């Protein structure tokens, strides 16, 4: 089968690899019909995340059709259409039973203290081959797949693999209640879903902060009040628009290495950041500028 395989920093290849096989009774094979590129993948491409294993298939977002299930998988069958959550969990340890799947004790082969297991990541996370391929092995299929209704197409379903849950739980952790004033910094895909989630939680006012017009326009279309941080100080503006009180909560959907305004980029911190990026990921535009990875959220 074909897969997107990482061989080294800036060395990503579409190549033929062996099809996966079920290696445990809890597993399943899914034929991918859609996959996505997360900005987290740029860390693996650029080398800003360590311990990537050569030959790892990238990707942790996917939708597909179940082709085969292990003997212990009783809730799925061949032909089921599913979305695959990005993290891997056993479903039966104490953490999984209380809903903390990312803290699963059993999924990560590096041990209980190794951290979250997920597809297409570094050695510390498994490693597990990812979902940017034609077929994928799902280790714990009973809890590692979610059935997709026929009326939901792939482009919508794949948002449930990683992006929407990330934005939703950001809003959930902020403990948004009816009428609360919320500020979302960063209006990329995760930020947009954080805005949508805040609306679902009946937030009163939602402020969206970014400097990219298309993203601000999308946030505005969702009903958010937008602030362009390249044109105005977001902290001062938030104070002015809330009578000096500020928002009830702030959701950071950016990370530490986002683009800054032109004014900030000329300052000492901006120069320090640029130097760090050059040292850590010098090959920002390799292969004769055939691709241009941006600053992925951390």
What do these predicted ranges mean?
Residues 20-35, 48-97, 102, 129, ...:
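Glycine-rich beta-strand-centered segment in the early N-terminal region that forms part
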Residues 174-176, 201, 217-298:
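Glycine-rich cofactor phosphate-binding loops and adjacent beta1-alpha1 units
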Residues 39-46:
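Cytochrome P450 core scaffold surrounding the K-helix E-X-X-R motif
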Residues 1-4:
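Short structural boundary motif marking the start of a folded domain
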Residues 38, 86-146, 150:
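Cysteine-cluster motifs in flexible loop/terminal segments that predominantly coordinate metals
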């Amino acid at each position: 089968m074909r897969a997107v395989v990482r061989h080294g920093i800036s060395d990503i290849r579409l190549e033929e690899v062996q099809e996966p096989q079920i290696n445990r009774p809890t597993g399943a094979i899914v034929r991918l019909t859609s996959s996505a590129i997360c900005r987290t993948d740029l860390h693996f491409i650029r080398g800003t995340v360590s311990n990537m294993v050569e030959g790892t298939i990238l990707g942790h977002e996917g939708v597909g059709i179940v082709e085969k299930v292990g003997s212990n998988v009783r809730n799925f069958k061949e032909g089921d259409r599913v979305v695959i959550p990005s993290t891997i969990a056993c479903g039966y340890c104490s953490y999984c039973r209380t809903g903390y799947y990312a803290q699963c004790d059993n999924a990560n082969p590096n041990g209980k203290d190794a951290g979250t297991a997920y597809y297409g990541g570094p050695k510390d996370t498994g490693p597990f081959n990812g979902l940017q391929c034609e077929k994928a092995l799902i280790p714990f299929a009973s809890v590692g797949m979610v059935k997709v209704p026929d009326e939901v197409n792939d482009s919508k379903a794949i948002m449930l693999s990683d992006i929407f849950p990330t934005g939703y739980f950001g809003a959930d952790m902020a403990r948004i209640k009816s009428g609360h004033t919320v500020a979302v910094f960063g209006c990329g895909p995760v930020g947009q879903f954080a805005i949508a989630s805040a609306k679902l939680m009946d937030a009163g006012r939602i402020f969206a902060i970014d400097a990219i017009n298309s993203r601000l326009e999308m946030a505005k279309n969702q009903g958010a009040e937008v602030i362009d941080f390249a044109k105005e100080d977001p902290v001062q503006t938030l104070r002015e628009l809330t009578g000096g009180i500020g928002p009830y909560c702030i959701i950071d959907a950016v990370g530490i290495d986002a683009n800054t305004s032109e004014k900030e980029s000329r300052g000492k911190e901006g120069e320090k950041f640029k130097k760090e990026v050059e040292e850590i990921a010098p090959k920002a535009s390799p292969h004769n500028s055939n691709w241009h990875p941006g600053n992925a959220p951390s």
